[in-house]
A protein has these predicted regions:
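Conserved substrate/cofactor phosphate-moiety recognition/catalytic segment
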Residues: 17-65
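Glycine-rich phosphate-binding loop used to anchor ATP phosphates in small-molecule kinases
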Residues: 52-113
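Switch/connector loops and helix/strand junctions flanking conserved nucleotide-binding motifs
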Residues: 113-120
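Small-molecule kinase domains that catalyze NTP-dependent phosphoryl transfer to phosphate-bearing small molecules
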Residues: 122-175
Length: 191
């Protein structure tokens, strides 16, 4: 059964870049947050219908787990650790993968607000996330979310035995992918 690697952290911390690098290194499937968030936002507006977004993701994970020979999945997510709906979603995902014989591991990415503001508008970010094309608006939302939610843990992570923290100001996406793969002994598909 496949495992799930949840890469989480605040906006523009490097989740997609690290997830992409990890997928290239391991051959795992890369399922970034905006693959579901963008279509839901196009229909209902950004931030609307969070229950629908969670249900869509659960349905996709359920179908993925039903596929024979499905590789492990890398999922990126802005997890508001103090938001009950986000925590409930993660609990459901953990239960789903564990019931199927897989495990869920968490990679928390951290970086300073000034660094993340600089990263808004990078080519990879814009290619994966149409909602980020208005860079000043995306930067304003980043600052707003920073003040509104707890987007990084502070020694109180609910799954400490499956938790790795990496500072993306210290490591490149490729270096983060190498550290993640080494930490959980993921095979290197690139060799």
């Amino acid at each position: 059964m496949p495992d799930l690697i949840v890469i989480f952290g605040p906006p523009a911390v490097g989740k997609a870049a690290v997830g992409h690098a990890l997928a290239q290194r391991t051959g795992f499937r890369f399922f970034h947050n905006h693959m579901t968030a963008e279509p839901v936002a196009a229909l209902f507006g950004w931030g609307a219908a969070p229950w629908l977004l969670s249900q869509l993701r659960i349905t996709l994970f359920t179908e993925a787990l039903a596929q024979p020979n499905m590789p492990s999945i890398i999922f990126t997510f802005v997890w508001a650790l103090d938001l009950e709906g986000d925590s409930e979603f993660i609990q459901k995902v953990v239960a789903l993968f564990e019931a199927s014989g897989g495990q869920v591991v968490f990679v928390e990415l951290v970086a300073s607000l000034p660094t993340r503001l600089e990263r808004e508008g990078t080519p990879l970010r814009l290619s994966l996330k149409p909602s980020k094309h208005n860079v000043p608006s995306a930067q304003a939302l980043l600052v707003e979310l920073e003040g509104q939610y707890k987007l990084n843990s502070t020694n109180d992570f609910p799954y400490p035995e499956h938790h790795l923290v990496l500072n993306t100001e210290q490591y490149s996406p490729l270096e983060c992918a190498q550290r993640i793969a080494a930490h959980w002994c993921f095979n290197d598909a690139s060799t």
